Amino acid sequence: MLNNAVQQNYNVSISKKGEDYQYYWSIGYMDNEGIKDGDAFSRFTTRLNLESNVSKYITVGLNMNFSSRDESAIAVDTKALTWFSPYCSNDVNNPESANQHYPNGSNTIANPFYDRKYTDKKQVYMNLDGTIYGRLNLPFGFSYQMNFTPRLAWNESFEHKSAKNDAWAGEGGSSFRQHNKAFNWQVDNVFNWKYEFLDKHKVEATFLVNAEKSQ
């Protein structure tokens, strides 16, 4: 019921910068085992940054992130560690055993692996977010930048409990399904003005016009 948990983490990235452009791309994957049997999850991430100077006055770019987290694993109930006799045997995979469901021979303490054997589960969370921007550099210290920042989050949850489990046979088993999705965005219009005089005095003003929506 308890493991020597191992965490694996892998990352790779590439980047380059030129006179009029630069980019960065990374990919990461993590596989995490919990100390309890079945208490595990995995995660995939990627990030992309791009920027290009289209001309002396115009710059465009984006910074985007995506992540996917899988929490489909089913952990056992470790409280059974303090309830079972050390002489119990784990017969969860032996349908002919009288102790397959209740290792103690009593129906008061169930095998912590038994319910998981008859359960199928998928639970995944995904996120996509970032910023797409354009910047305009104007004479006399003026500049304007527009940022579009979207965020999309969604998850999928599926669970099936089979009627082959004698504890669920009376109700014919059960199924559960859920989809959730959330999307929001915002647009920032940033106006900036910088002015320097007498070689030591600086004046700077910034104005922001914003719009946003969640759904």
Model region roles, listed by residue range:
Residues 1, 34-41, 45-129, 145-215:
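Surface-exposed loop/interface segments of Gram-negative outer-membrane beta-barrel transport/assembly proteins
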Residues 1-37, 75-77, 114-121, 134-137:
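Residues embedded in well-ordered regular secondary structure
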Residues 7, 18-19, 55-57, 137-139, ...:
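Outer-membrane beta-barrel channels and translocator barrels
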Residues 142:
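Solvent-exposed beta-hairpin/edge-strand motifs
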